[in-house]
Amino acid sequence: MLNLVQKIIGSRNDRFIKKVSKTVQKINSLEPEFEKLSDQELKAKTQEYKDRVAKGEALDNLLPEAFATVREAGKRTKNMRHYDVQLIGGIVLHQGKVAEMRTGEGKTLVATLPAYLNALTGNGVHVITVNDYLAKRDAELMSDIYEFLGLSVGVIVADLNPEQRRESYACDITYGTNNEFGFDYLRDNMAYDKEQQVQRSRNYVIIDEVDSILIDEARTPLIISGASDDSSEMYNLFNRLVPFLEKQEKEELDEDQEQKDFYVDEKSKNAYLTEKGYAKIESMLKKEGILEEDDNLYSPHNITKMHYLNACLRAHSLYQLNIDYIVRDQEIVIIDESTGRAMPGRRWSDGLHQAIEAKEGVKINAENQTMASITFQNFFKLYNKIAGMTGTADTEAFELHSIYGLEVIIIPTNKPLIRKDHHDEIYGSVREKFDAIVEDIKQRISKGQPVLVGTASIEASEVLSTLLKKKKIRHNVLNAKQHEKEASIIAMAGYPGNVTIATNMAGRGTDIILGGNLEVEIAQLEDPTPEEVAQIKAEWVKRNEVVKNAGGLCIIGSERHDSRRIDNQLRGRAARQGDPGESKFYLSMDDNLLRIFASQSMAERVKKGLKGGESLAFGFMSKVISKAQGKVESYHFDIRKNLLEYDNVVNTQRKVIYEQRQAFLDSDDVSEILADIRIDVAEQLFHDYVPAGSMHELWDLEGLEKALKSDFMIEIDLQKLYEEDDNLGEEDLKKFVREAIEFEFAEKTKNLEVGAVRQFEKFSLLQSLDSHWREHLSSIDHLRNSINLRGYAQKDPKNEYKKEAFELFSTMLDNFKYEVISSLAKIRIATEEETQRAQEEWKESMSEIKAEHESVIDNNQSEDDKEQEEAPKVQQVKREGPKIKRNDPCPCGSGKKYKQCHGKVVD
């Protein structure tokens, strides 16, 4: 019924394309007029548009003229004219939607249209790419158009200093990676000086490969962190013990067989000890002297040992060298499961990275304490408007809309797509599958057809490479180990008879041109003569025809990915811009997708029905594969949604802290803020010892005196005051305490320079807030990792998390207030020169900070990547009273810890 309705009235996508086609006609009608303009007249259009925007004209009204201007500038500077479908793509992006455009349709050129239009407001436009190479390339390619029209272009890459970053962000249009933009946001919210902040407002962002960034990267929050205690000995110990544990296979779990030591869940990438395994590891730990004879792993004080054990168990049973990671320069480098790229700098969390370092015998780096973090979901929601481009988003349209509010519009191709997609072939074993792939490659290259083989792991690419070498078939391997050669290998992948093996779509972002990349060939020549260029072009035309006649680029997939979208990305490398092309996937029943997610009974039936070397290729198996992929996609969507629901709690708190922190940073005088905090602190302190509305017998004036002396350096005999004045009531005493705290601070600062006092107050506020926020993030991490246990008590973990996270946040804010007032009371205020010197030291330390992007492994891990050395603490103050640590006995004599007595929260 739905198909019938769509045939009559068209789909929503068709209706949208039809509607915006009218705007495209308007743009086309302006082309003859704009062609007549001189260069100066065309350039002057930019200022004209800016003036009109400043007077209140909407960007939508300007769109036809602005797009016509950019199209004309493209023709004059790059000899590139925007096609009508590219204009449609530009309109989609301007409207804050996702444009799905096939490979080779010119997404980089499309972005110039909405980028120019939205830059006219003066609020800046950010264009996000997946790596530094593409950010630099796209900025350089399109800068001629922007600069011709009077707009400035900046690029943000990893090696820029703060001043260079600030200049790039100040440009009208700024290119960069999602990691760099996100880390700069976090660093700006750690700055102690406005001059150290580099970003301005987040106005409009265009995200290239939006599916990769907003979906594949959604489980990997950005985290800035500092090193914690060294625990390498414990990781080395458990790394030695874990190999003695025996794994229980999946098929043995439901059978009446003798229990083994542990089993794994490959879907969630977790490993679980059995009771036998617990007993075995306890026995080994007692022999090692780590556990006492009467001790056990279930004891609360052994929770850290369980942390090391679990990490090492997962490292040995679930993570494999050359599949999940590689060892490069004596470091563990994670391999992105979606792209096959090596990701230097990223680290797994929850001790997994340290466990793998121990497993591979490389240096174990310390675990880290989170200093600042944010997920990509919540970072991009900070922008006023988000838009995205990709070749494959339609399969993830629901997630993009439900989480980001982004509608996906499929843009028609400029020329009809004529790729031939063959049925999948399914073999009984991996070896039979690879043999069939090699035979297919051999036949195709014999007629001059280039082949791109997509594999799911480095191990698979190397196995296939070995088989091709045995057959003496020349080929290039493109995976995480050859990342540096990526662009040059891809540029020539379209040569007649060339064979290229790429792991999980490494090389995405670079077009494969039939016959090879002509521009790259010409660029490699030194001072070529016109004759040489003409000869190269003639040779390329011949090669191009040979490849087209052979069927175009052939894509071979060595297995299906968990996601249909990744498969479509691989297919999309063929048949660009109306060229011919083919695609075919080879599978085996031992592939991870079918092994983990297809039913065991079905797999056994298929294997029994296949004789050696035989394959299946019919519709039934396609349904099985689609169903398996649907299960995985649904599973991963639930994980991302779950992560977002938990992170939204912290995100609300983050906004409060960062807004308050920015208010401190922007203010030259925080004395009024501190005065309000002193009132809050005095009142809460008073009521800790004198309960509101209580009888005198319940008052603890002696305890209040001790607290005032130890925490605020104030000596008052409150008991004597009360005894001398019978009319002195609760409110009078409270007022007295408040005025005593105010008087003490006024006395301390009355002979000091006002500028020094104001600067020092501000610095103290920022330092104290940062310190408490870091501690709070650590507490939230521990809460997040343990909250699922509440389910055993018939409680909803998410509701419990929200409630306890709020309580932790309230406690943190109260502790912050109390500590900052107490600290200011105890220390000698530094001179203005000392404070400035401390700030300069802090700036230097911040310039050395590194930020890393860790990888989340399962749904129990809400953070990821951590590495970054904590800034050295500056010594800008001197303490007059003794420092009371939070776990020290409270000086009031109650016998409680300070944090549970006078160091506790106040309103």
Curated annotation (Swiss-Prot):
Top-rank taxon: Bacteria
Binding site for ATP: Q86, G104, E105, G106, K107, T108, D511
Protein's cellular compartments: Cell inner membrane; Cytoplasm
Bias type Basic residues, positions: 896-907
Bilayer disposition of the protein: Peripheral membrane protein
Biological processes, Gene Ontology terms: intracellular protein transmembrane transport; protein import; protein targeting; protein transport by the Sec complex
Record-linked Pfam families: P-loop_SecA (PF21090), SEC-C (PF02810), SecA_DEAD (PF07517), SecA_PP_bind (PF01043), SecA_SW (PF07516)
Cofactor binding comment, as recorded: May bind 1 zinc ion per subunit.
Keyword annotations from UniProtKB, A to Z: ATP-binding, Cell inner membrane, Cell membrane, Cytoplasm, Membrane, Metal-binding, Nucleotide-binding, Protein transport, Translocase, Translocation, Transport, Zinc
Region (Disordered): 838-907
Keyword flag Metal-binding: yes
Signal peptide: none
Binding-site positions, Zn(2+): C890, C892, C901, H902
Gene Ontology MF terms: ATP binding; metal ion binding; protein-exporting ATPase activity
GO cellular component: cell envelope Sec protein transport complex; cytosol; plasma membrane
Self-association state and partner proteins as the record states: Monomer and homodimer. Part of the essential Sec protein translocation apparatus which comprises SecA, SecYEG and auxiliary proteins SecDF-YajC and YidC.
Similarity field: Belongs to the SecA family.
Protein's name according to its UniProt entry: Protein translocase subunit SecA
Gene: secA
